[in-house]
Amino acid sequence: MAGYTAASAKAEQDWEAKFRALPDPANLRSYMERLAARPHHVGSAYDKDNAEWILARVKEWGLDAKIENYDVLFPTPKERALELVAPTRFAAKLEEPTVAGDATSSQHDEQLPTYNAYSIDGDVTGPLVYVNFGVPEDYEQLERLGVSVKGAIVIARYGSSWRGIKPKVAAEHGAIGCLIYSDPHEDGYFRGLDFPAGPFRPKDGVQRGSVMDMPIYPGDPLTPGIGATPGAKRLALSEVQTLTKIPVLPISYADAQPLLAAMSGRVAPEPWRGSLPITYRVGPGPARVHLKVSFNWDTKPLYDVIARIPGSTSPDEWIIRGNHHDAWVNGAQDPVSGAVALLEEARGLADLMRQGWRPKRTIVLCFWDGEEEGLLGSTEWAEDHARELQEKAAVYINSDGNDRGFLNASGSHTLEKFINGVARDIEDPEAKVSIWKRLQFRRIARPDSAADRQEPRTRADLRIGALGSGSDYSAFIDHLGVASLNLGFGGESEGGIYHSIYDDFAWYSKFGDPDLIYGKALAQTAGTAVMRLADAELLPYDFGDFTDTIRRYVNEVEKLAQDMREQIIEQSRRIDEGLFAAIDNPSDRLLPPPKETAPPFLNFAPLENGFAALQRAGEQYSQAAARAAAGGGAALANRSLREANAKLIAVERALTLKDGLPNRPWYQHQIYAPGFYTGYGVKTLPGVRESIEQKQWKLAEEQIGRVGKVLENAGEAIQSAAAELAGGN
C-alpha cells in the first residue's frame, strides 16, 4: 500500500474493512426521503432546514461542525412570457404539471419556475432561427447555408455542450434572444418510455439551469476571487462579466414543437434533426416569436455545512471531502443521491472514532450550498479560505449525483494510481467482483479496436478522466491547484428528469438506484479514499501515470496543430480549384467555406523540453519512493516525513500560474480547465489547445513557452520531494 509501512498498512486495512461494513442502504434511503421531501433551492426555507438538519446529524454523531454563510446574487423569475406571433399565434405554457403517482411533483408553490439563472432581463421580438445545439460548429454550418442569426431569436436543443455556451455563441453572432429546449431525441420518448411509465423526460419537462459564463469564473458574480462575506467589496451589476448578453429561456418540447413547426426555410441538415414529428427547418421565418423575461436580482444566503475531524499528527494537512446539498427542485438524483453517501461516510468515520481510530491528517467534510446556480457555496468557501487552503489542502474529493453501474473517476493524474488501488478493494454490489475489475471488463468489452481493448488488459492502472468544471471541485483544482478527484457511479440507469420537478424520490426509487446499493458503494469508495489519504505516512501521489498522461496531452496538441494546418491548406486548395462549386447540389446549394491563410509552423520545443524535465523528475521520485518502501518501509517509519509531504502537496500548486489562462485569470491550473466554448467539458493544456483551436497563432507560441516552463517548475517540485524523501535513506 503506497505511503505505508508494512505494519501501518495492515492496521489501515483493518480499519478500512471496519468502515466498509458500516454504510447501510436503509440509512441512505431515510436520508434521501428527508432531504428530497421538498424543493430546496438557494434562498428557500427547506434549503436552510436541510442544512440545519445535516448539521444536527453530524453533531449528533460526535463531529465538530458548523454552518458557514455567504451572501450571493441569485436572480429568480419575475416575469416569463414566450409566444409565437406569426404566422399563427401560440402562447407557451412554461409549466411542468403534476404527474399521477408522484406526490412531490404537486408542490408548485415551492418550486422554482422553469428558467435559466443569470440570463439578463429582456423583451425582444424577432424571427426564429434553429441552430441545432448552438455550438460554434453549428454557426459555421449556418454560414454555409447562407443563414444569419443577426437580429433573430435562436432556438437550440440541449446537448453537445453545457447550456451556457448556447446564448454566449448566439450573442457573438448577433442574436437578440435564445430559447433552449429538450428534444425527445436526447432524453425523451426516442430513448424509451417517458415518466411516469419510464425514466425519460415527459413532454412538459424542462431542464432548468444556470447560464452564468462559468468558463470566465464560477461563484458569486459580484465577488470574483474573494469570499462573498458581508463586508466584501461587490461589483455593480453592470460590471459583472458572467451574465448572458441576451435573454434566455428553457422550454419543453411540448412548447418547442409549435415554434419549430411554424418555421420554413431550408430543411435542417440530417444530423440536426431531432425526434419531434415535424420537418426540422432552419428558418429564418416566417415564424416570429416574442420573448420576455425579467428577474428579481436579489442577494440570498448560502448555508455550507462544514465538519472537521482533527488530525492526530499532521493536523495542518487537510483531506477535504464534499458534495452539495442544494437542488433546483427536490433533487433526489442531483444532488441528494451523492449527499446521502457523504452523510453515511460521516456517520461511519464517527463510529470508527468511538472505536479508537484517529486520522493522522485533518479530515474536512463539506456539504455545499448553491452548486446548481454556479458552484456558489464551494467557490465562496474556497475563496474565503484561500490562503489557509493553499497552505494546508492536500486533496479534495468530490461527488455529486450518483446512479447505478460503473465507477466513474476523474481528477488529478497524480492520484490515478491511488484511486485505482482503492477501487481494487471495493466490491461491486451487483457483479460481486471489485469495482475496478468490473470497470476493466467494461472497457475491454466496449472498444472496437484491438489496441483499445488491449490497454485495459495490459496497463497497470485504468485511466481516469480529466476535470473541467460543472461541480464543486472547480475552485480547488482549477483555481487553487489542490489535487482533486470526482467520484460516482453510473451507466446503468438512464433518464430525462435532470433539473426538473420530476427529479424526486418517486423517480429515483424506481429508476435510479432503487435499493441504494450504489449509494453504499459510493460511501465505501470515497470513505476508503479519505481514510487512506488521511492515514498514510507519505501522501500516495504517483508521477508515473501522471507523466504518461501529460505525454498524451503534448502529443494531442502537436497533432492538433499539424492537422489544422493541413486542413486549412487543403481547404484553400479546394476553393482555388473550384471544387465546392463543381460538386454543389444546385437544388440545395451551400456557400463555400471562407478561405484562410495557412498558419505558421509552431515550435513545440519548449513544451517538449518541459515535459522531458518533468519525466526525469518523475523517474527520480519513483526510485526514491521505492527505496523508502523497501524492507517493509523502515525508512518511512524512522523519520519525519513532514517536509516530504509538504513538497508533494506543492507539486499540484506548481501546475498553476497566478495570472491564469488567457482572458480568464481565475482559472490558474495550466493542465486542466473547462473549455471556453465547452463549459463543463475539459480542455487539457488549455492555454495551448484553445489558442490553436481559435487560430490565434502568436498566442499559441506564447502559451507553448508558458506551459513548458510550468512543466519544468512541476519537475523541480517533484525533484525537491524526491530529494527530501531520499534524505532519510
What do these predicted regions represent?
Residues 4-8, 14, 33-153, 184, ...:
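Noncatalytic luminal/extracellular "stalk/propeptide" segments of secretory-pathway proteins
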Residues 14-22, 36-45, 114-119, 153-160, ...:
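Second-shell loop/turn segments in exported
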Residues 31-34, 66-67, 128-131, 153-157, ...:
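Structural recognition of the beta-strand scaffold that forms the well-ordered cores
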Residues 89-91, 202-267, 314, 370-509, ...:
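Metal-dependent peptidase/peptidase-like ectodomains
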Residues 106-141, 216-333, 347, 351-355:
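Soluble metallo-hydrolase cores and metallopeptidase-like ectodomains found primarily
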Residues 128-200, 312-318, 328, 343-344, ...:
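A conserved hydrophobic secondary-structure block that centers on an alpha-helix together
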Residues 184, 305, 321-375, 380, ...:
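Alpha-helical metal-binding/catalytic segments enriched in His/Glu/Asp
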Residues 630-729:
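C-terminal amphipathic alpha-helical interaction region
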